[in-house]
Amino acid sequence: MKFALRLLSVITTFVMLIVLIGGALVTKTGSGLGCGRQWPLCHGRFFPEMNPASIIEWSHRMSTGVSTILVLALAVLCWKKISPVFRETKFLVIMSIIFLLLQALLGALAVVFGSNALVMALHFGISLISFASVLLLALLVFEATRSETKLVKPLHIGKKMQFHIYGLITYTYIVVYTGAYVRHTKSSLACSVFPFCSKDGALPAYFNQWVQMSHRAAALLLFVWIFVAMFHAMKHYKEQKQLYYGWIISAILITLQAISGVMSVYSQLALGYALAHSFFISCLFGVLCYFCLLIARFKYESKEPFK
């Protein structure tokens, strides 16, 4: 049973990541209406027509359907087997289900009735929360089925580190929204050079350029903030390996995220760079959510405040 639960948690997390990347693929390739304004059918049929847009949209719908079944199965088993061990299990189960259903509903409504960029930019963010919830459930599954040292130990986490973690997870979500808004307003190539919008460094001239440059400015602050948090962890948390290495991983991910973003511009939105951009931010958000789990464990299990 332990092996089966672990395997299910890994497969579910992987499929949720596919759903995230698949949604980005749908947006990048303009395949949102590849099946017309019908849901769940594709142009009145279960199987799509043999053209790229229909296949991409249909595959995304199928992966969402598979992920729903897997998440529900994992949720039931975690509720029964893991929640008696870890109190946070029920919260994560509820979050994973609610946000998975929300993202599926939002996607279906957008297909049938249409939507605007402000609303559709939420679609990726909602999926991101569901993915992170499933990822944390998978960590709890592995922790609960181990007989040795805990994977998620209660740590001493100071107020400054808590500020970095809570602030960064909130701000990262905002940056994710601005990035999704860039995609849905078709502003990805509004500025053809980097770091400025034009070679002469002039201010943005129209709406799409302002959208693109706003995202770049927000992403730059995120990049700097994560490195500040990493240096703080390296100085004060050398003995607490989850935080020490977690922040190093975060710095690597935000660097790869920045590189993939720049290369997306210079490659004229080459699909590989564009999808990598979504992949790295998903992983980064997952790491930050893991930090939040560490804080929750620390606050619950520590009797004295960390000085």
Swiss-Prot record:
It catalyses: Fe(II)-heme o + 2 A + H2O = Fe(II)-heme a + 2 AH2. GO terms for molecular function: metal ion binding; oxidoreductase activity, acting on NAD(P)H, heme protein as acceptor. Its main location: membrane. Residues 1-6, 87-92, 143-161, 238-242, 296-307 are cytoplasmic. Its EC number is 1.17.99.9. InterPro entries: COX15/CtaA_fam, COX15/CtaA_HemeA_synthase, HemeA_Synthase_type1. Residues 28-65, 114-121, 183-216, 264-274 are extracellular. Heme o binds at residues 60, 123. Heme b binds at residues 215, 277. This is Heme A synthase.
